[in-house]
Amino acid sequence: DTIQIVSIEIIYGVNKIPGAKIVLLDGDMPNNKFPVSDADDFKPGAVITINAGYANQTSTVFKGIVVKHGIKLDGDNFSRLIVQCKDSSVAMTVGRKNANFVDSKDSDIISKLIGAYSDLSSDVTDTTVSYKELVQYYCSDWDYLLTRAEVNGFLVTIDAGKVTVKAPQVDGEAVLTLTYGIDLMAFSADVDAAAQFSVVKGIAWS
């Protein structure tokens, strides 16, 4: 069957769970039905793969699971199905947990946190410092992972269930060049000096 797509929005970000929003035309007013919504394709928990490209040359740009499924109907009878998706790593954000990590490095802790989820894989830069004990107290695995990554100056990126935890690369050639007026669709940049101090003085003792 053919499903009419209104829009697809995919969001990737550093230290963020990737997500996608799919808007589809849906609604059979004479029969009071929503056939696309009633099907199993977009039910919560369903695995979604989004491919994009030109002609027959497409590649996967997002893979995740449906986390939210909603119907919207406007006054002009414009009805649509809105599907919110998240990368499978969203499971790490569910529930607050407690754990003790004894004689462990941060890289070992991060790998262990990710390894607790069968749908995820990891690529974690090795760290050197071993701690006698670290405590995860009433904190989701995702939040604790971000905390330990930040301690080491690492960034967390995710693609199709693979969680990469590495230091940012500030040298080498750019992997992408965008040109104003050619391929830059939208851009927003701000400089906010509202909380900028002209002078900072500190006093400390030991």
Residue ranges and their predicted role:
Residues 13, 25-27, 53-55, 65-72, ...:
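Solvent-exposed coil/turn segments that connect beta secondary-structure elements
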Residues 30-121, 134:
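Surface-exposed cap/loop segments at beta↔alpha junctions
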Residues 200-206:
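Charged, gly/pro-rich, cysteine-poor intrinsically disordered low-complexity regions
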